[in-house]
Each structure stands twice: as structure tokens, then as C-alpha cells.
Amino acid sequence: MKNTAAGVPFILICVLLDILGIGLIIPVLPQLVGDIAGSQSAQAWWLGAMLVAYGLMQFCFAPTLGALSDRYGRRPVLLLGIFGLGIMFLVPALSQSLPVILFSRILGGMFAGNIAVAQAYISDATDKAHRA
């Protein structure tokens, strides 16, 4: 096994970005949706959809990202995840369309299943004697 412990800071940054993707937009989202959506019921629907979309897609696509990391390697899958999250962080800042923002949350959630890949990377970097 090659020594991959040098990549641990990269892994921690990937996990941090995944976690930021969940909650970073929460303080801004009510104002953003309130400016675009009309009624309170529409605002509530859009807020709920945007908050659920990220977590649901993360839950659904984590096994897929894990399988891809087994096939193509951990680092390429993690880099793909960072790219997808970068798009997700950028789109709400530039868009005035709720469906586009919702799509960015869905896309971000699809790419944010990197926690499982990060755990596999750490497992690869740890020798059997030091595993729990």
C-alpha cells in the first residue's frame, strides 16, 4: 500500500465543503426565496424543496460515488465532487430563477456524497495495525 497520508488535508477540505453545502445557504435562502416567490405557501414549498433536495440527493448518490471511487480511484471522484459543489455554490449567487437554484441544489447533492469516499480514502491510508 502506498503512503496516502499526505492527502489527508485534501480529504478534510472535501468533507468540509460537503458539510458547508448543507447549511451555508440556510441563512440566505429565506430572503432569496422571499424576493422571488410570491405567496407564503410558495415560499414554504421552495424552501422545503431546496433544503430536502440536497440531503436526499446526497443520500441517494453516496453509494454511486463510492462505487465510482472503487473503480476509478478516490482522488478523481473527490475532485469531481468539488467541481460539482463549486457549481452549486456559484449558481444561487448568479440566478434569479427558483427552478435553476433548486436544480443547483439537486446537482450539489449528487456530487456531495463524498463523505463515504473520504472515509474509504482514510481507510486506505491507515495500515491495518492502526485501524479500530
Feature map (PLM): residue ranges:
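Cytoplasmic helix-loop-helix junction between adjacent transmembrane helices
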Residues: F103-A132
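Helix-loop junctions at membrane interfaces in 12-TM secondary transporters
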Residues: T4-V8, V91-S104
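Extracellular/periplasmic helix-loop-helix junction of adjacent transmembrane segments
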Residues: P30-F59
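Residue-level signature of mid-helix packing/kink "hotspots" within the transmembrane helices
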Residues: G23, L51-P63, G113
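Pair of pore-lining "gating" transmembrane helices in MFS-fold secondary transporters
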Residues: N3-D35, I106
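Conserved MFS/SLC helix-loop-helix module at the cytosolic interface between two early adjacent transmembrane helices
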Residues: F59-P99
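Helix-to-coil boundary motifs at intracellular loop junctions of multi-pass secondary transporters
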Residues: L32-A37, R71, Y121-T126
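Residue-level signature of the transmembrane alpha-helical cores
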Residues: C14, M50, L78-M88, S104, ...
